[in-house]
From Swiss-Prot:
Gene (name only): ftsZ1
Organism of derivation: Pyrococcus furiosus (strain ATCC 43587 / DSM 3638 / JCM 8422 / Vc1)
GO cellular-component term (any): cytoplasm
UniProt record similarity statement: Belongs to the FtsZ family.
Protein known as: Cell division protein FtsZ 1
Keyword Transcription: no
Length: 372
């Protein structure tokens, strides 16, 4: 996990290692097989909603997510203009006139409903939809649940990946986030929750703006990791139906990341992942686990150690799936990302689903966080 933080802080632009393709003579059956593969390939869309969500998809466009269509959605025209995506949607043109939602989830919700037809058209044909946003503001908090409902009703496996605000951002954003999270759980198959406060336990001296970038990077790694286990050729890939089996009606999920380059790197990485501050739940009753293993030279014995360790720590009836991606840039490091589904989270409370009222009715101390 610390290596991930270091990579964000000291990121250097390098061209990815390219392995030359071996030229193989094509036959008529190869062409037919290619067509069949294209027809059965899972269509995965990633939708970034609001300022934080658009920051995340912008980063995804930089690093590349194999086999995914990237869509940016916002009420703020100026912010949307700066984002890189395969498709951009300015929602609520009549309601907000492109000026944003003003940290009001109700405006974000109404903006998405106003643009429902355009959103529906953009999601047409998707087998799986990731919705990513930072909860606590207006657009992401309000619009993401509407988009999740649309995607799920259209038959797509709908997975929301969201961050919760830092405590220092104030009670208003915390209450808004709670409201948005409840609605996302209602309308998504699975909601992966990343509490930003937990980043402070990983790297307490991290500058605030860098902390937001690290949060973005964790969102990116979660979506990219799951997607490419399906779409990108690797040492061990997952079938889309495997992922559906774990994440369909998966409820609340948490993520843990661990890494090690020691002699016992596999076991240490698995232990770090399950003891990650981000994995802030009791996983013993979890209904499912998705394990993403990556490294330059992962051995089968090491993969077995990781899988057995995770399996021992979740419910015996939990469905555990796993895959391995070869990443030369990790060198001697093994990285383990686990997504644990069907957990009971303290971030979901049985209170009434309403965002915090206006500042005049419920005063709170707010800290303005600049856009990154």
């Amino acid at each position: 996990m610390l290596k991930l933080v270091e990579n964000v802080v000291g990121r250097v632009s390098e061209e990815e290692n390219k392995v030359p393709e071996v030229q193989v003579p094509q036959s008529s059956i190869d062409e037919e097989l290619k067509k069949i593969v294209e027809q059965i390939k899972a269509r995965i869309y990633v939708v970034g909603v609001g300022g934080a969500g658009c920051n995340t998809v912008n980063r995804m466009m930089e690093v590349g997510v194999t086999g995914a269509k990237i869509i940016a959605v916002n009420t703020d025209a100026q912010d949307l203009l700066k984002v890189k995506a395969h498709q951009k949607i300015l929602i609520g043109k009549e309601l907000t006139r492109g000026l944003g939602a003003g940290n009001d989830p109700k405006i974000g919700e109404e903006a998405a409903k106003e643009s429902e037809r355009e959103l529906r058209d953009a999601l047409e044909g998707a087998d799986m939809v990731f919705i990513t946003c930072g909860l606590g503001g207006g657009t992401g908090t309000g619009a993401a649940p509407v988009i999740a409902e649309i995607a799920r009703k259209m038959g797509a496996l709908t997975v929301s990946v969201v961050t919760l605000p830092f405590t220092m951002e104030g009670i208003r954003r915390a209450k808004n986030a709670e409201y948005g999270l409840k609605r996302l759980v209602k309308y998504s198959d699975t909601v992966i929750v990343i509490p930003n406060d937990k980043l402070l336990e990983v790297a307490p001296k991290l500058p605030i703006q860098m902390a937001f970038k690290v949060a973005d990077e964790i969102l990116v790694q979660a979506v990219k990791g799951i997607t490419e286990l399906i779409t990108k050729p690797g040492l061990v890939n997952l079938d889309f139906n495997d992922v559906r089996a774990v994440m369909k009606d998966g409820g609340v999920a948490m993520i843990g990341i661990g890494e090690s380059d020691s002699e016992k790197r596999a076991l240490e990485a698995a232990e770090q992942a399950l003891n990650s501050p981000l994995l802030d739940v009791d996983i013993s009753g979890a209904t499912g686990a998705l394990i993403h293993i990556s490294g330059a030279d992962v051995k089968l014995e090491e993969a077995q150690q990781i899988i057995e360790y995770v399996t021992r720590n979740v419910d015996p009836k939990a469905q555990v799936i796993w895959g391995i991606q070869l990443e030369p840039e990790l060198e001697k490091t093994i990285r383990v990302m686990v997504v644990i589904t069907g957990v009971t989270s303290r971030y979901i409370t049985p209170e009434e689903e309403t965002p915090l009222e206006t500042p005049e009715e419920s005063p709170s101390i707010e800290i303005s966080i600049p856009e990154l």
